[in-house]
């Protein structure tokens, strides 16, 4: 079956970016089936979840695999639509935020939060597990991991405050 993912994992979230992201995903899915966005958004929230942290990995989007309800042509058109929408939405956010300055504390926060990405990929991701179990090329399988990641035992009060704000955003249902 067919599968794809369209998601974001911001470290410093902006509400308008998240809403625009989800609206674009919804609009892309509605061209093919009005029920796809809700279903695939829920799939995304369930799949990209870290049970050992009790948190989602990002602000969601859409996720589907083994999709077989569309004919081949419509499936390919939907994949193209998802890819085009992803690129446009992401570029819109980059252009909107490209001049945003981040403090050293925010950069440190980003490095620590990237650890969640690594944790998910190494513990829960089916694609990573499949690649490792099938004796695939390890470097290729792990190439998607961030080159810089940090874990800390004792977190500053500023970090705890940033994490609390982020988790309120991440664990919210953003379906539009």
Residue ranges and their predicted role:
Residues 14, 33, 132, 146-149:
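Alpha-helix initiation/capping motif
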Residues 1-6:
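Short, small-residue-biased leader/transition segments that mark boundaries at the very start
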Residues 138-176:
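TerminUS-proximal long segments
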Residues 125-144:
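Amphipathic alpha-helical/coiled-coil segments positioned at domain termini
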Residues 72, 131-134, 159:
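Intrinsic-disorder-associated interaction segments
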Residues 73-129, 165-176:
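Extended, compositionally biased non-globular segments
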Residues 7-100:
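Long, contiguous internal "core" modules enriched in hydrophobic/ aromatic residues
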């Amino acid at each position: 079956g067919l599968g794809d993912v369209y998601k974001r994992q911001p470290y410093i979230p902006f509400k308008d970016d998240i809403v625009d992201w989800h609206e674009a995903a919804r609009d892309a899915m509605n061209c093919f089936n009005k029920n796809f966005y809700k279903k695939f958004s829920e799939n995304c929230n369930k799949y990209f979840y870290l049970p050992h942290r009790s948190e989602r990995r990002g602000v969601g989007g859409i996720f589907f695999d083994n999709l077989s309800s569309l004919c081949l042509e419509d499936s390919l058109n939907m994949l193209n639509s998802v890819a085009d929408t992803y690129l446009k939405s992401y570029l819109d956010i980059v252009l909107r935020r490209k001049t945003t300055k981040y403090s050293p504390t925010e950069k440190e926060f980003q490095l620590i939060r990237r650890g969640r990405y690594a944790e998910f990929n190494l513990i829960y991701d089916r694609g990573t597990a499949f690649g490792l179990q099938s004796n695939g090329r390890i470097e290729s399988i792990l190439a998607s991991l961030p080159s810089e990641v940090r874990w800390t035992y004792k977190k500053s009060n500023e970090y705890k405050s940033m994490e609390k704000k982020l988790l309120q955003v991440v664990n919210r249902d953003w379906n539009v």
